[in-house]
Amino acid sequence: MSATTLPNVSVAIIGAGIGGLTLGAFLRRLGIPFVILERTAVLTPLGAGISLAPNCLAALEQLGLYETIRQNAQELRGINVYREKRCWGTIDFGLAKQWFGYNVLSIERYEFHRYLYEAAGGAGVVQLGWDVARIEGLENADGDLRVISADGREVHTDIVVGADGIRSVTRRILSRSMGLQPENTIRFTGRVHMSGYTKPLSHLSTTDLGIGHWMLYNDCILTTWPCKENRQWFIGVKAAPPDEKSPDRSVWKGATSDTVNAVYGSRFHPFGEDGTVEASMYAIPAPAIAGNSRDDKLSIIPNASSLATSSRKPTSRTWFGAEWRSWVMVYRT
């Protein structure tokens, strides 16, 4: 066996995101040999927060992760829905455990990712810098598959699982092998997103713990989700300029704290010390992210590829958390 060939495994998982790591963690518990091939050379924190529903937590308990996550997450007790300053009502999550066996929990995404990484076996099974170029042996009935990277490394396996996200290399390779032609059905909705994470909001009381907000302003949206220590994970949505037709641009591109506060800074928010978003969400300085992304269904997908390499200095003040990034929203026709 050459130095560029990994030992044979039963399953090769392409992608070390949440899906790939979760599958790896289950395979590890079952004693099934596997490897996870990740294109990124260095794993860095991505995303702001994530909410975990009861069906997800049931699976995580099977992996032995539930107690760790519960201790480091915040229970979601309710979401207050506002139209400008008027409260339309509250979505009560208090019965989730009674009905489904678990509460809904919110946790920092990178922390959740780290727990899954360790549960899957960490560096012992996750191969970084694996830019998959091709999969050979798809025509073989005996299941002998070879996953080959752009730099010539390869792994022999019985099963290949594509867990590599919306721009899936696995899907493209399989489509070509089946003679399918790609079709671009993506359309830009004209909505762009940003997300981030605040520092602990010390002025909030214990009654505020676990309460989220959907703020429906006339020309934009801001949703805030409770996390541990009264920190808030937030998502903002804003319309692009009327003449903006390209999903490759963003109204947040090159944004500074002034740009963001021009959209949300003076808006009403119940957690604001003076009733405004800027007061409720002020945090440590944050670098600006110039990239955006696109998806092939109605959802939001992050792109923080420029975060690690950005030379831009942090702005002096912003109501964001330690980092924030931008999205575009697209849909499939």
Curated annotation (Swiss-Prot):
Q: Where is this protein found?
A: Membrane
The protein's superkingdom reads Eukaryota
Q: Which cofactor does it need?
A: FAD
| Topology with respect to the bilayer | Single-pass membrane protein
Give the sugar-modified residues. 303
Induction comment from the UniProt entry of this chain: Expression is positively regulated by the cluster-specific transcription factor pytR.
Disruption of the gene: reported phenotype? Abolishes the production of most pyranterreones, but accumulates high amounts of pyranterreone 5.
**Cystine bridges:** none
Keywords of the record: FAD, Flavoprotein, Glycoprotein, Membrane, Monooxygenase, Oxidoreductase, Transmembrane, Transmembrane helix
Extract the InterPro entries matched here: FAD-bd, FAD-dep_Monooxygenase_BioMet, FAD/NAD-bd_sf
Pathway assignment: Secondary metabolite biosynthesis
- The transmembrane residues are 6-26
Q: Does the keyword Cytoplasm apply?
A: no
State the Pfam families in the record.
FAD_binding_3
Query: Can you tell me which residues bind FAD?
Result: 38, 109
| Molecular function in Gene Ontology | FAD binding; monooxygenase activity
Enzyme Commission (EC) number? 1.-.-.-
Tell me which GO cellular component terms the UniProt record holds.
Answer: membrane
Function of this protein?
FAD-dependent monooxygenase; part of the gene cluster that mediates the biosynthesis of pyranterreones, a family of antioxidative compounds. The first step of pyranonigrins biosynthesis is performed by the hybrid PKS-NRPS synthetase pytA that condenses 4 malonyl-CoA units ato the acetyl starter unit by the modular PKS of pytA. The acyl chain is then connected to an L-serine through the amide bond by the modular NRPS of pytA. A tetramic acid is formed and released from the PKS-NRPS pytA to give pyranterreone 5 with the help of the thioesterase pytI.
Q: Can you tell me which family this protein belongs to? A: Belongs to the paxM FAD-dependent monooxygenase family.
| PANTHER family in UniProt | MONOOXYGENASE (PTHR13789), PUTATIVE (AFU_ORTHOLOGUE AFUA_6G14510)-RELATED (PTHR13789:SF309)
Q: What is the protein's name according to its record?
A: FAD-dependent monooxygenase pytG
**Gene name tied to this protein:** pytG
